[in-house]
Amino acid sequence: MADKSKFTEYIDKALEKSKETALSHLFFTYQGIAYPITMCTSETFQALDTFEARHDDIVLASYPKCGSNWILHIVSELIYAVSKKKYKYPEFPVLECGDSEKYQRMKGFPSPRILATHLHYDKLPGSIFKNKAKILVIFRNPTDTAVSFFHFHNDVPDIPSYGSWDELFRQFMKGQVSWGSYFDFAINWNKHLDGDNVKFILYEDLKENLAAGIKQIPEFLGFFLTGEQIQTISVQSTFQAMRAKSQDTHGAVGPFLFRKGEVGDWKNLFSEIQNQEMDEKFKECLAGTSLGAKLKYESYCQG
């Protein structure tokens, strides 16, 4: 993941802010979407418009709790395999997080730059599309995503907790969580998944066959790796391997970022009524869409 000192320094500051923040005061709204005040500011969003993407930037777009830290590790290892240089993150890698001066500093960073983001498609800087940066879009089924949200808030010390799973579920379904609605994010990206510079990755596919999932990433980015290199990276990138070293790579929050990673963990918390509500929401927003088919909802979120 990121350079330990930079990553942990940013996370430590965010956790320190969280200590004094009640859940009811955790979010601010910018252009209609809720963001955590511990990680984002309106000044940084305003400065984001000045960000100048490069054609060889690698953008990792995902809704929160859908595997962004996992993909960051995988792409970093792919770059290392090609260049023989460990990828360094001079800034916290989430594009919209940090101070408003970060985009000026990023001009001096060497290529390729890895840029993670949880922004909806229409909130991304226009230069990403103008300069044809490569975009990996990572999705995870909405039921497990909601459960992961709940455990992150309620297990990590110092982060404001929800009173119950039912409370988190209500807020998740209304889109009143960090980075807004999962379904708005999905609807927004659905229209653009077939673009020449966009590659869709499903979290559940990586869990099922990590080596096959990893193999398609360098092919999309234009890297050549041998089968042996792919296999080595897949062994280093299993969820279990990531969890084992998470405290070294991500600091105290690491074990919570790599809590379980299981497909189907939602069954431990969802009531039958909540599952039906999620089914209806999915049908309303994504039934008959390209993304709806790619998410394999019937396989992962029903029964």
UniProtKB/Swiss-Prot annotation:
Xref: InterPro entries: P-loop_NTPase, Sulfotransferase_dom
Protein's name according to its UniProt entry: Sulfotransferase 6B1
Gene3D superfamilies attached to this UniProt entry: P-loop containing nucleotide triphosphate hydrolases
Gene Ontology BP terms: sulfation
Organism from which the protein derives: Gorilla gorilla gorilla (Western lowland gorilla)
Gene: SULT6B1
GO cellular component: cytoplasm; cytosol
KW Transmembrane helix (keyword) present: no
Keywords: Cytoplasm, Transferase
Family of this protein: Belongs to the sulfotransferase 1 family.
Catalytic activity: thyroxine + 3'-phosphoadenylyl sulfate = thyroxine sulfate + adenosine 3',5'-bisphosphate + H(+)
Lineage top rank: taxon: Eukaryota
Places the protein is found: Cytoplasm, Cytosol
Enzyme Commission number, as recorded: 2.8.2.n2
GO molecular function: sulfotransferase activity
